[in-house]
UniProtKB/Swiss-Prot annotation:
Residues 6-147 form the SprT-like domain. This is Protein SprT-like. It comes from Staphylococcus aureus (strain MRSA252). The keyword Metal-binding applies. The active site is at E68.
Length: 151
C-alpha cells in the first residue's frame, strides 16, 4: 500500500461513514513509533504508521483511519475532538472506530535497561536510563543498580 491508495481509502471512508468529504492529505509516516496514527490540528492532515499495515493488515489501517477521521470531522465542525469529549465518544461509537490500536512492540521488547534493588532484589526494566542516585526501589526504598543493558 502506498500514499495514493491510502489517500483514496481515507476519502472513500469519509464519504461512506461520515457523509462528508476529506479535503486534506493522508499519508504514511514511518517516524511514528508508539501510535497507530495522528490527526494534525494545524494542517488537518492525517498520518498513519506503516508498521500497523505491515503487522496487522488493511483492517487495522481502516480502524485507525476511522478513529483519525472522527478527530478530523469534529475539529472541522468546531465540536469536541479530543478523546475525553462526549462528541468524540459518540461519533466514534456510531462509526465503529476503536479507542486504541494494537501495539507493535510490547514494553518488554522495547526495554533497554534492567535494574535491581540492592535490598530486596526487585527487578525493574526500563526503556530510558534511570538516575540511580535519585531513584529508589518502590517496594523497600533501597538503592537501585543497573544489572545490564539489554540493547
Amino acid at each position: 500500500m502506498n500514499n495514493e491508495i491510502l489517500q483514496r481509502m481515507v476519502e472513500n471512508l469519509s464519504e461512506e461513514k461520515f457523509g462528508r468529504t476529506f479535503q486534506h492529505r493522508a499519508y504514511f509516516n514511518k517516524r511514528l513509533r508508539t501510535t497507530g496514527g495522528r490527526y494534525l490540528l494545524k494542517s488537518h492532515d492525517i498520518e498513519i504508521n506503516p508498521k500497523q499495515y505491515e503487522h496487522y493488515g488493511e483492517d487495522a489501517v481502516v480502524k485507525i483511519i476511522l478513529h483519525e477521521l472522527c478527530h478530523y470531522h469534529l475539529h472541522i465542525a468546531g465540536k469536541g475532538y479530543q478523546h475525553k469529549d462526549q462528541d468524540f465518544k459518540r461519533l466514534s461509537q456510531q462509526v465503529g472506530a476503536p479507542r486504541f490500536c494494537n501495539s507493535i512492540e510490547s514494553y518488554q521488547q522495547r526495554a533497554n535497561y534492567e535494574y535491581y534493588c540492592t535490598k530486596c532484589h526487585a527487578k525493574y526494566i526500563r526503556i530510558r536510563k534511570v538516575d540511580t542516585n535519585r531513584m529508589r526501589c518502590g517496594h523497600c526504598n533501597g538503592k537501585l543498580r543497573m544489572k545490564r543493558q539489554l540493547k
